[in-house]
A protein has these predicted regions:
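Transmembrane helix boundary and interhelical junction motifs in multipass membrane proteins
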Residues: 23-31, 151-161
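Hydrophobic alpha-helical segments of membrane proteins
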Residues: 149, 182-189
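Juxtamembrane transmembrane-helix boundary motif
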Residues: 1-16, 34-38, 42-43, 62-146, ...
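Single transmembrane alpha-helix segments in multi-pass membrane proteins
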Residues: 10, 15-29
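Small-residue hotspots at the loop-to-helix junctions and early N-terminal turns
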Residues: 42-47, 174, 178
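Short hydrophobic/aromatic, small-residue-rich stretches within specific transmembrane helices
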Residues: 49-53, 177-181, 203, 207
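Transmembrane alpha-helices of multi-pass small-molecule transport proteins
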Residues: 48-63, 112
Length: 256
């Protein structure tokens, strides 16, 4: 990594970490485009992004665990299902072309822009009803898909999914998401290391920087209105849908 790249990567890493701790994402929404801009191929960028997500998500998760704000049984089921499914999906990523992965990202983000409503989240209660363990296991599989196949943490998918389908309060969904992202990214990173994909040192440098900001923002999650959290999630999803779609189209047009 050259000095110019470093001067760009460090502040963007801090931004990724701040968003990760606040929204329960892994930071891949910033890491992946940054690594593509730095010249990595889509497969290499997505693998390196996964390496960066590990310390980023762990930074937020450690804060939530210290505060004892994650129910242990539900968190364990979510984390284990995310870890195991990421091992599976990380093997499948090699079978797809780079533009296929980017197109899948774009479609996923577009769906998210209409799945969560700020007004519904604002009106929802913070009281926690008994959570369906099977449903949380399914959310963990979604995290594994995002982390293993797409090189994303999956928080932008999991948080709306838990809020809309499982009626999980958005702050708790964000905490669950941070834990699931850490587990799925860890599993996918192990597979990528075995296969020799990505650049671990670059990923850990980005992630280590982001982890500092993730711990800071995660500790302040309760100070942010639920409606604002939902609005931020939707705005990021729309922005990334457009960017991923543009990159997918460029790669598809370059193919012989």
């Amino acid at each position: 990594m050259e000095l110019g790249d470093l001067l760009v990567a460090v502040p963007l890493g801090l931004l990724a970490g701040a968003l990760a701790g606040l929204l329960g994402i892994g930071g891949g929404l910033i890491f992946a485009p940054l690594l593509l801009w730095m010249g990595l191929s889509p497969h290499q960028a997505l693998a390196t992004s996964t390496f960066a997500i590990v310390p980023t998500a762990m930074g937020g998760s450690v804060t939530h665990l210290r505060q004892r704000s994650i129910p242990w049984r539900e968190g364990l089921i979510l984390g284990v299902s995310a870890f195991l499914s990421a091992l599976l999906f990380s093997r499948l990523g090699r079978l797809a072309d780079g533009w296929h992965l980017l197109l899948l990202q774009s479609v996923m983000y577009l769906v998210l822009t209409v799945t969560i409503r700020s007004e519904e989240v604002e009106a929802a209660s913070d009281a926690v009803a008994p959570l369906p363990l099977l449903g949380l296991g399914g959310v963990g599989v979604v995290a594994g898909l995002a982390g293993g196949l797409l090189g994303l943490g999956g928080g932008l998918v999991m948080v709306p999914l838990m809020v809309r389908t499982l009626s999980v309060p958005i702050r708790l969904a964000i905490r669950f998401s941070s834990l699931a992202v850490a587990c799925s990214a860890s599993a996918a990173s192990l597979q990528f290391l075995v296969e020799g994909r990505g650049q671990p040192s670059m990923g850990l440098l980005l992630g280590g920087t982001a982890a500092v900001a993730a711990q800071w923002s995660a500790s302040r999650l309760d100070q942010v209105r639920p409606g604002l959290l939902a609005t931020l999630l939707r705005a990021l999803a729309l922005l990334l849908a457009l960017d991923s779609g543009r990159r997918a189209l460029q790669l598809a047009l370059q193919m012989p």
